[in-house]
Design a protein with these regions (language model features):
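Structured alpha/beta reader/binder surfaces that contact nucleic acids or chromatin modification marks
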Residues: 1-141
Length: 141
């Protein structure tokens, strides 16, 4: 499992399932689960600008400096038809995004292997989520 630090508001948009691609200047061959870490610094793009450009209302305060969720990279392409795609970048195509309980954690640059303690915790939460859905009970994390 990997971990990727992303600035807010983008991290929350991903784990809420709204943003379906993550734009990067570099490609990846990795396919699989990724823990989403919200960086200590928020992006310069304001909540108002996100609402104007993309029609999505954001909370006034978002968690910083910790784990906020998990997603899955299923492809890496350039270009991509998503409204979230930034021209000239590589689009990490994301599926099965969902929030996790916030956990303070130091982030890393690039796409890195997640420490064992994070991987096992996320896999456990991930497995319970899938099991609950199969039984017809949607479980929110």
């Amino acid at each position: 499992m990997k971990i990727l630090s992303i600035r807010q508001s983008w991290a929350s948009l991903i784990v809420s399932g709204v943003k379906d691609v993550e734009n990067r200047t570099w490609p990846t061959r990795y396919r699989g689960p990724v823990i989403i870490h919200a960086s200590l610094r928020a992006d310069d793009v304001s909540s108002e600008e996100i609402e104007l450009r993309f029609g999505v209302r954001m909370p006034s305060e978002l968690p910083l400096g910790g784990i906020v969720g998990i997603t899955e990279i299923v492809d890496c392409v350039r270009p991509h038809p998503s409204k979230w795609y930034a021209v000239g970048h590589y689009a990490f195509v994301l599926k099965n995004s969902r929030p996790l309980p916030f956990a303070k954690w130091k982030g890393t640059q690039l796409l890195r292997d997640a420490p064992d303690e994070l991987s096992s915790c996320s896999i456990s939460i991930n497995s319970r989520s899938r099991l609950s859905r199969k039984r017809g009970r949607a479980k929110r994390n």
